[in-house]
Amino acid sequence: MQQDDEQEKSQQLQNFQSDDLLEKLKLLNYEKHLLKEFKLKPLSRFYFVKATNPGEQFYMFTLICWWLCKKLGKDMERPQEYDDPNTVAANIIKLLGEIDVPVDFQPNKLIRGAGPICLSVLEVLSTQACKVAQVGYQKLHIAQEEEFLGDYLEDNAEIILEKLEDEQNAAALSDDSDMELEAHNFRQLNWLNRPQKKSNGDVNLDERNPELDARMSDHQEWHLELERVLPQLKVFVKADARDWRTHISQMETLKTNILENSDTAEAQLKKLHSEFTFDLEKIESREKHLNNELKPLIQQFKELSIELSTIQYAQNQLQEDMEKQTAELNEVMMEQELKKEEMERRGQAMSDGSSVQQIRKAIAKLKDDTAQLNLEVALLVHAHDQDIVVRQLQQNQTTDLANNP
């Protein structure tokens, strides 16, 4: 029991720290300078109380620490989601040591991204950042609310003096010494009711005081007078909505209603709990029975599933091989078609007589060209021989002239 109380107190302390941390971050305008810049969602009030998503919470924790360190004027590399958590935690502890914050925990405590250690670190950094930013705090101002008399407050504020009549009747049985005190009390009550009588246009009570004093001596007349004015004796108390007495009375009323309704609700909840428990036990027993009956079939299904997977894998392999062979076959067939077209084209060209005629024309042309070339060669040889003969004759003439001067 004591351990449960301690856990509850610790949980309440963490909730308070988380709420206080969020308020400080709002004072530092983290929604504009941090969330909007990195396109992040706003934090809930108890985001760092319990670890629900350690990866995301650790990244958010390191990002807020980095932002607060910037506010404090400390240099720290902005953490990324893929960074080593141990390195980032070590850097945070190093910065805590630089600002003289005692560190009595291991770095791996920060890797969870939530819990009392992370809350303490963020609380210290946010407090220091608020001091550096010189955030001003103002005294809480409670706006004056309009005075009103609600239904509930009217019932409690309007005092109908029925109890006073009973008390006066009981006091009438006492000795005569108490009569003077009762008369004095009655004068005070008449004095309280005096403004209402004046406002209604009744006779002024000051003029009737001697008559009332005379009638006070008679006990019976005193009671008749009391019965006459008793319905008009109402005291209105101005109620304040912030009065702690009103809150206590409301709390007591609510507590009474809760206690009255809790018995019925508790009985119904116990009945539902017993029904749910019985149904769950039936479902569990039925599940066990079905598992025992279906166990051989499940085992057979597993074996057939494995065999089916093997066959499907082999089928996929054969299908891939068939696709490859089909592609190769298509290529061979295309090549065959090309060869066939080329052979048909060549056969058609060979069977046609135009090629033979072209060959004959080419041969005849070659013969003409050969005869022309032979003629040109003969002419060249003749010209060459003639030139040689002319030179020989000129040489002989020159020799003869030299011998016969």
Swiss-Prot record:
Kindly provide the name given to this protein in its UniProt entry.
Intraflagellar transport protein 57 homolog
What the entry lists under PANTHER family is as follows: IFT57/HIPPI (PTHR16011), INTRAFLAGELLAR TRANSPORT PROTEIN 57 HOMOLOG (PTHR16011:SF0)
Q: What does this protein do?
A: Required for the formation of cilia.
Q: Which family does it belong to?
A: Belongs to the IFT57 family.
- One Pfam family here: IFT57
Which GO cellular component terms, listed alphabetically, does the Swiss-Prot or TrEMBL entry include? ciliary basal body; cilium; Golgi apparatus; intraciliary transport particle B; microtubule organizing center
Chief localization: cytoplasm
Species annotation? Drosophila melanogaster (Fruit fly)
Task: Tell me a GO biological process for this protein.
Answer: cilium assembly
Question: What is the annotated localization of this protein?
Answer: Cytoplasm, Cytoskeleton, Cilium basal body
As recorded in UniProt, coiled-coil segments are 252-380
Keywords from UniProt, A to Z, are: Cell projection, Cilium, Coiled coil, Cytoplasm, Cytoskeleton
Q: What InterPro entries does its record include?
A: Intra-flagellar_transport_57 (IPR019530)
Q: In terms of domain of life, where is this protein from?
A: Eukaryota
